[in-house]
């Protein structure tokens, strides 16, 4: 039995092609994935992300609990609304999930975690929180809409109240604020400016329609995937999972090694991996000739081999790009098995497009 988001009827109205996405009926596209992709890069597009899981953590030990739970350090968060991206690890240093944490106070935080990992995430939160004076509350009374693109903020502003516009004016990236009934955050998964808006379920369809009327194009999971891949952003389950260290997934920047006294789950394994440089690394791959780099393809480098974790045709660049996990010794080029022959690809840092422009 698949679940439906509160915006299901709006997707059907817009002619969406629906697919089963980890138990949720979600739009893969509304007719043209490439047009939806380009709308986000050049103007404004919106995604139904109501399948994401919102969890509020409250209590006198909320900060201590999160300092144990995640690899990044929530003590860095001191300004209300500031957000932090972090992996949540198992004892072997593998990634249970990646998530965003919003800081309200030292006793109140909000987590946004992936839909595909909801059951195991909630079970893990329940298990670890048992040792702390905290409450863990799933907020399934909300929907969520991501509005992304160079004109996303301006178009959103046209349908907010004066008070709401004042509350978000000049808000830096990776912040969120509750204003009226909406929680509006300057986060996203596209490499563009925009907002992620948490809205009470009963208001979600109206907000979606207002955004449509303001000229924001609906975009499906297909465009969401090509946009995040161009931006070099990981997709859980493909680019990392419980068997993959964050050090092998371009996530070293999300690990707070100091203070050394903070004993987060998985720390000892990561410290050893960092010391002996034992993990693979994540790189970007670029194929400027014909062909599409595909997830699961073998990557052959001097002295070893790796694997493409995510690959696609990049509508912005006009050729194929990929994220791959490869040996640390990998140089500037590699070879990929395509149609039973080896094709040479360029090896670059993960990330290909930001704010509509190539960063290669």
From Swiss-Prot:
One of its GO terms (biological process) is glycine decarboxylation via glycine cleavage system. The glycine cleavage system is composed of four proteins: P, T, L and H. It is an enzyme of class 2 (transferase). Belongs to the GcvT family. It comes from Pseudoalteromonas translucida (strain TAC 125). Its EC number is 2.1.2.10. One of its GO terms (molecular function) is aminomethyltransferase activity. It comes from the Bacteria. One of its GO terms (cellular component) is cytosol. Pfam families: GCV_T (PF01571), GCV_T_C (PF08669). The glycine cleavage system catalyzes the degradation of glycine. It catalyses: N(6)-[(R)-S(8)-aminomethyldihydrolipoyl]-L-lysyl-[protein] + (6S)-5,6,7,8-tetrahydrofolate = N(6)-[(R)-dihydrolipoyl]-L-lysyl-[protein] + (6R)-5,10-methylene-5,6,7,8-tetrahydrofolate + NH4(+). This is Aminomethyltransferase. Keywords: Aminotransferase, Transferase. The gene is gcvT.
């Amino acid at each position: 039995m698949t679940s439906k988001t509160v915006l299901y009827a709006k997707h059907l109205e817009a002619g969406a092609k629906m697919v089963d996405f980890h138990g949720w009926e979600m739009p893969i596209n509304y007719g043209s994935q490439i047009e939806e992709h380009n709308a986000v890069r050049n103007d404004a597009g919106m995604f139904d992300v109501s399948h994401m899981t919102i969890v509020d953590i409250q209590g006198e030990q909320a900060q201590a609990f999160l300092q144990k739970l995640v690899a990044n350090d929530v003590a860095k968060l001191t300004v209300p609304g500031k957000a932090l991206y972090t992996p949540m690890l198992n004892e072997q240093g593998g990634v249970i999930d990646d998530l965003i944490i919003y800081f309200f106070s030292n006793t109140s935080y909000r987590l946004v975690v992936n839909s595909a990992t909801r059951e195991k995430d909630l079970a893990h939160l329940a298990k670890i929180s048992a040792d702390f004076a905290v409450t863990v509350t799933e907020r399934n009374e909300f929907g969520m809409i991501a509005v992304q693109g160079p004109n996303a903020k301006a178009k959103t502003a046209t349908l907010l109240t004066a008070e709401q516009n004042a509350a978000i004016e000049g808000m830096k990236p990776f912040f969120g604020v509750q204003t009226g009934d909406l929680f509006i955050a300057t986060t996203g998964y596209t490499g563009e400016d925009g907002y992620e808006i948490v809205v009470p379920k009963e208001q979600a369809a109206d907000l979606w329609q207002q955004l449509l009327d303001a000229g924001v194009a609906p975009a499906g999971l297909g465009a969401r995937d090509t946009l995040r891949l161009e931006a070099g952003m990981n997709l859980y389950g493909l680019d990392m999972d419980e068997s993959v260290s964050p050090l092998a997934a371009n996530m070293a920047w999300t690990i707070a090694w100091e203070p050394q006294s903070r004993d987060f789950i998985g720390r000892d394994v990561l410290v050893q991996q960092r010391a002996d440089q034992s993990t693979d690394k994540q790189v970007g791959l670029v194929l400027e000739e014909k062909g599409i780099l595909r997830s699961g393809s073998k990557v052959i480098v001097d002295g070893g081999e790796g694997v493409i974790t995510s690959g696609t045709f990049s509508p912005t660049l006009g050729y194929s790009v990929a994220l791959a996990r490869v040996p640390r010794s990998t140089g500037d080029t590699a070879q990929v098995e395509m149609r039973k022959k080896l094709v040479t690809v360029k090896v670059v840092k993960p990330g290909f497009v930001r704010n509509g422009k190539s960063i290669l």
